[in-house]
Amino acid sequence: MKSLIYGYGVTGKSFERYLIKKNIDFDIYDINISDYSSNKDFSKYKKIYCSPGIPREEFKSLKKTNKVLTDIDIFFKEDKSIKIGITGTNRKSTTCFHLSQLISQSDSTNLIGNIGNPVLDEINNGKKYSIIELSSFQLDKMSKNFLDYGILLNIAPDHLNYHNSFEKYKVAKEKILQAKHSSHESDPYNLYEWITGKKSKKLELQNLPLRFEFIKKNIVNDSKSTNSNSLFYAIKEANFIFNENNYSLIMCGDPSKELYTKINIKGPREVIVFGDHRDEIQKCLTHKKVQVFRGLKESLIYLKGKENILFSPGYPSGKDYINFEERGAHFNFLVKEVLDD
């Protein structure tokens, strides 16, 4: 009896590699990929391996009649490392990255999940610790929490178009606290001591790109800003560094993720909005001066000669880009092309 991979993105492809290693026969289904979108009789499959991004109602429906597994469920069952799960609306990647640098001083460490390699690619690879960045999608679909350490950094409204309400999003995030040991601590040095029982020497911790990253003395690339909470954090930092009313904010992305919530922008001298969702974003904003452009290049041409720029989109990429990485790279490229000549 065959199994089925449901969703053929990054996680789906890791399921494929995993099942091939296990000599398990399988089919693939993904409604968004024509080669794999033909209708399936899901009841005929022995197991269904589900990617985290599939809609939660589809997942709930599959679970009624099938044995459904996620990559996290499999990793929990098979891997023997000490498992540290980290989640939060913001700064989870940075916290994972910083904690990994501290633990790696003395012990072997996997950095996996949303931040690194898919978890299935690193099962029992000999590392002592596994630091796993977990999204609300993964936590929502996780059958049972077998983490040794679960860390919830913060919660603010996000992914509301998936969870349907902030309360459901919060419930998903808080599942991480069902670990053997749980914490709300965010300082990586305190987390290191809590987990290992040792103090770490102070390091010059490396940061991830596109998180309030200065690409020039007066230009910040914060492309990782995909929600209003991270946007407000960036504005607070910019208000301190550049001073209020002394910088321009550039925004873009899809506001449907936050159900078109109204946001009041205080700090920048002007807000520049561009992209396919520009009209939707403009309707969500309150600011004394909002300038709207079709594309990023036109936005930067307008800003040429102006002092201090904060690129903090505040929304996920939507129709404009594949992801925040592509968005951030495009911003860096156009800054060089438009502003450096």
Where are these regions (language model features)?
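Short, basic phosphate-binding NTP loop
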Residues: M1-G85, P209-R211, Q282-L285, F293-E307, ...
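Nucleotide phosphate-binding/pyrophosphate-handling subdomain across enzymes
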Residues: Y18, S108-T109, D187-R269
